[in-house]
């Protein structure tokens, strides 16, 4: 079990309470409170400094010899039997990653995520958010697993290269899921693995918007094939212009521009990262297309009026271009 903690407060203590009896590694990414001293009595604690989520996860993975790596956020409460259910699902050789059913901690009759969803533009959000918890009753394939609570086989984690540390924060789980799909593995959500998550849907702050947007573009540029990028170019451009307008209205256009500037400055790294990612590919775009949706969910994203028309246009475009995949 690997928990990456950053100023997690009492949430970390609550999380460790739910993991009693498990072999837990806590990566201290910047915690300074009494929760770290408490964690040291119940888990192996590694002081990493604020190296970012992905780097913290990679460090934690190196500190455990387990064949199955289970990652949970410090703001989760893992229910009895969840870890065993995740491990059982990974016994299927074609399954690489398994997400737990995530319920809202403060409204446990509702889902936080039944598997995360990816738009053709790379925008992503927790699927099933707010739905009744019993709406997820059977394991199923998903686009990618939420980083809040998931398991992956160690050999697959190594094969995929672990988390990309350059992302630093946000979208690491999205990229890992895409690399698993490129390699031909399946990604599942398993309702028998039950986890509560202290998640609140709210508008991101400016710094979070920077990482979300920059990293979304890193994933799109590295994971999509050239053909898919060309076919989706009008959609990607329209979404990018729309997001720039939203950023201007909401006051985070500077952060949006910082993301573009980072990509330009680091274009050599991005090209190298794309080559490494595409080298994993064992399946074609037709197989991957089923994990992309052309419909933006207005419940999850703060979208302008007219989104229904945009969804209709993008859906029509996606239906048309998929025949060329």
Q: Language-model features: where?
A:
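A short, conserved alpha-helix in the catalytic core of glycosyltransferases
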Residues: 143-194
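Short aromatic/hydrophobic "clamp" motif used to bind/position activated sugar donors
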Residues: 69
